[in-house]
Swiss-Prot record:
The lineage of its organism: Eukaryota, Metazoa, Chordata, Craniata, Vertebrata. Residues 76-133, 189-224 are annotated as: Disordered. Its main location: nucleus. Keywords: Nucleus, Tumor antigen. The keyword Nucleus applies. It comes from the Eukaryota. One of its GO terms (cellular component) is nucleus. It is found in: Nucleus. The gene is Trap1a. The keyword ATP-binding does not apply. This is Tumor rejection antigen P815A.
Length: 224
């Protein structure tokens, strides 16, 4: 009986030794000593997961980048073909624009020549008008100079209080003429008195001529 019970004790003893070893480990290492190892373990796990996530994201970006490059290449080919067509159209447009510019330049030259001819004709007409005006002014100045001293113009009689005055330009290119007296008032009165005397002398001469004609008509001096 005692022999049969020994293995059971041994078995139970072995189990008891295992449980005792575990308890001894817990008692052998304190919690403070285990925490640093746990921290390093957590750090390693986090770092590994972060690197794996980063590699996954990089793979996605590389795939997207390759797609973008392929799309850009296709678009560039299309744009190059479109640009070639546009260049051809631009060349044609430039050709026609050059022809239009040549035509416009030709017509512009003709217009410029016509304008030059019109300007020359206008200048000639203005010169002729200025010459005519200068000739008229010269003639008028001579006539006014001749009558400046209130002398009687041949074939005309000066009325009373009539005074001849010179005409001058008020502006450089006048639109109207302004007459102003040149001589003082006393001289004008004197000249007007002389004009009255001349008129009186002419009347006396006319009366004398009439008397002579009457005498010629009556040579004997008798009235009819």
């Amino acid at each position: 009986m005692s022999d049969n019970k020994k293995p059971d004790k041994a078995h139970s003893g072995s189990g008891g030794d295992g449980d005792g070893n575990r308890c001894n480990l817990l008692h052998r290492y304190s919690l403070e000593e285990i925490l640093p190892y746990l921290g390093w373990l957590v750090f390693a796990v986090v770092t590994t997961s972060f690197l794996a996530l980063q590699m996954f994201i990089d793979a996605l970006y590389e795939e997207q980048y390759e797609r973008d490059v392929a799309w850009i290449a296709r678009q560039s080919k299309r744009m190059s073909s479109v640009d070639e067509d546009e260049d051809d159209e631009d060349d044609e447009d430039d050709y026609y624009d050059d022809e239009d510019d040549d035509d416009d330049a030709f017509y512009d030259d003709e217009d410029d020549e016509e304008e030059e001819l019109e300007n020359l004709m206008d200048d000639e007409s203005e010169d002729e008008a200025e010459e005519e005006m200068s000739v008229e002014m010269g003639a008028g100045a001579e006539e006014m100079g001749a009558g400046a001293n209130c002398a009687c113009v041949p074939g005309h009689h000066l009325r009373k209080n009539e005074v001849k005055c010179r005409m001058i330009y008020f502006f450089h290119d006048p639109n109207f003429l302004v007459s102003i007296p040149v001589n003082p008032k006393e001289q004008m009165e004197c000249r007007c008195e002389n004009a009255d005397e001349e008129v009186a002398m002419e009347e006396e001469e006319e009366e004398e001529e009439e008397e002579e004609e009457e005498e010629m008509g009556n040579p004997d001096g008798f009235s009819p």
